Each structure stands twice: as structure tokens, then as C-alpha cells.
């Protein structure tokens, strides 16, 4: 195991320690791989590598024999419930959903595996958490003919997860308080004194900040946002839904980076005066699906993954979600989207978390 692998594994170990609120932790990736790796069962490996002209028929027959699957998901409860219901209607296979935030899903998957409890079949989460499962050797490499239809950023080389949708980090603003001609085109535009006292930011936006840093360079990024904080101040709040709601209500005028989904939902469902614009460097993040190495219902799990890469892709836009399928062409055009690199983020997450806190430590609260 090389130094970069150890660095990535130690980052995951620290994250899992934080999530489980442990007092002390053995850096798990310094242990022999046999201690931390969960070996796939024969049926899981067979389901994951199923191929041939009759793959669909064999997969469906074995999936129906299993009759159900267990899903840990981070997608919104309403959205994942609709997708699961459509899957159940089409195939007659029950989907048991446990929905939580990405940190909780990762914590449960890791904790159960280390305790020898194997209940989950499919984990649906953000790229960072899925890459963490890869490092922990809890996810099974999968072979699905539908992977080739996803954008390149949704296809990690190791094949231990596959992306099915994208989240956009966007500049959100109250459309009654900000004129269109005021909107920034790049983050450097936020140095303008017109933004003094008008900006808010998420208190833990590490994946966004890391990717901006990758695009602009570390030194330039730290200097730029340090100056924005010094000149104009930034209110720090916890939670992307909260930030979108605060912009909609006018309690804050604008948000440096939040998810497009929450803004679109407020505007669509409540006719709220909130909108968004992509600001350079514009950041996008992939979310996806992983198959547990000890999935109790591996064929049903693979059938569900196939469904999420096909039928579900056509359903996502109506839910204000962005499919990862090339054929859907759902990413807003005319924008040079910089995708979060989950593998690199896992290796550098501790560093960029520290830098983020340093830059925004003096922000107005």
C-alpha cells in the first residue's frame, strides 16, 4: 500500500471515527488488508459480473426469486420513494428504504460491516462517501452494460460504484433583492463592495471549496475567499436547505454555493423569489450507487442499479434532479462544469476542511 493509499484510508478512518463519536481509533488502513476487507460472497460476485445476451432475462429471474432488496439512500425521501415504487410496479420486487444524510449512511454501512451484520444491498450516496466505501473494501466491482451511457465522471476506474445523478453547486440569490445585472460571473466578482453584508455560506462546504481550489490553484483560492470575507463579510449557516430557504425569505440576500435542487424546489413548489446562477469555476458533484460485497439480495440489487441507470434517468428531470446519462443532456449548457474528484477529495479532505475553516473563521455569524 503506497503513501497516497494510506493517506486516503487514514482520512476515511478519521471520518468514520468522527461519525461514530469514538474516543480513540486504530488507523484501520495500517492493518493488513485481510482485517479490513469484506470478501464478496460467491452470489454477489456472480450477480455483479453477469453478462451475455441473456443477461437481462437471467438477472430478472434471479431477482424475482429473491423478491426484495434493502436500500440505504441519501436522495430525498419523496424522490427515492417515487423511484422505488416505479421499480416495484415494473418488476414486483419490494424495495426497503432507509433514508438518511450521506454521513449517516456511510456510518451505518461501515459500522454494520465491521460488526459482521450484512443487511444492505445497495448504497445510494455522494461520490465522496461511495469512494470511502471503496477504500474500506466494502463495495463490489459491478459490470452493467448501462454504465457506458453515463458521463465519464460517473464511471470510476475501479467500478465499485456508478454515478447516476449530479448535484450543482450554484450561487443562489433573492430575486427581489438582486438585479440580474448585479450577478457575479466569477467568484472574484464577489470582491465588489456591493456585496458587503449580503453574502452567506455553508459552514462545511468542503467538496465545493476543494474543487474551486483544484480549478484556481490553492494559493489563489485562499487569497480570493479570504479577501471576500475581509471586505464584505460572510454569514455562516449550517445546511443547504436552510440556506436556500433563507435566500428565498430574504433573510440573506445571496448564498455563495448551495445545491440547485433546493432552489428549484422552492421556486417551483412555493413560487419563492429565489433563483440561481452558475459562477465560475462552476462545481458539480456526482452521486451514485454501490453494491455491498455481502448483499443478501445481489440479483435484485443489480436489477435496481440497472433501473436507476435507465428508466430512472428519464424520471429525474421531473423531480428537479440531474441525470448522469449522456443521452439526457441535463447539465445546463454553456457552463464549464468542474466535477468534484471523489478519490482526490478523500485523500485531501482533512487538509481542505482545515483550510475552509481558516478562511471563513473570521466571517460574520
Regions found by a protein language model. Give the residues of each.
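Extracytoplasmic ligand-binding site segments that recognize negatively charged/polar headgroups
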Residues: 70-84, 96-113, 117-251
